[in-house]
C-alpha cells in the first residue's frame, strides 16, 4: 500500500471572499454561524470533482489504417456541479440552509470558497462555489432519508496548502 486514506475524518470547510474572485487564506469554518452541525457531520459522500477532458483528434490522413490515432487535450473541468450526499433531518436541513443564507447575504459579486481536507494530508482541495437550497429528497419506506445538496462551482484552485481550523 502507498499510504491510502479513508474518507472518514474528511473536513469540509468554507470561507466568504473579502474581495470578489480572490480565494481567502483565512477564515475557513465548518458550519454556519447560526448552524448546529458541521457540514461533515451530515455529509455521507461527495461527487462531481472528477474532470472531464474534451479532446480533439489530430490524426493525419496519411496514417495507415492500423496506425495510432492522435489526440490533443482541449477544455477540461468537471460539469460545475459538486454534490454532497447527506442524511436529511431537521438539524442538517437547518444547518445547510444557514450556510445558504450566509451566501445570499454576500454582496459585490462575492462568493464562498470551499476546502476539502483528507485525513493526514498537508493540502486541501479548493473551489469557489454557490451553495444551493436543500430540496425535498426522494424517499422510500424502511430507509433513512438521504439526498443531495449542491454547490455550483465557478472557479477552482485545486490542491493547495491546507487552511485548517482547530474547531473543524
Question: At which residue positions do the language-model features occur?
Answer:
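Glycine- and charge-rich intrinsically disordered segments
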Residues: 1-2, 168
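Solvent-exposed edge beta-strands and adjacent loop segments
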Residues: 2-85, 128-144
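Polar, enzyme-active/binding microenvironments
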Residues: 19-21, 31, 120-123, 166
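Broad gene-expression machinery/nucleic-acid interaction feature
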Residues: 81-83, 111-113, 146-148
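Acidic glycine-/aspartate-rich tracts in secreted/extracellular proteins
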Residues: 88-91, 156-158
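Short, acidic/charged, Gly/Pro-enriched secondary-structure junctions
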Residues: 93-128
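Short, charged, solvent-exposed linker or helix-capping segments at domain edges/interfaces
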Residues: 95-98, 160-168
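Short beta-strand and beta-hairpin "edge-sheet" elements
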Residues: 115-162
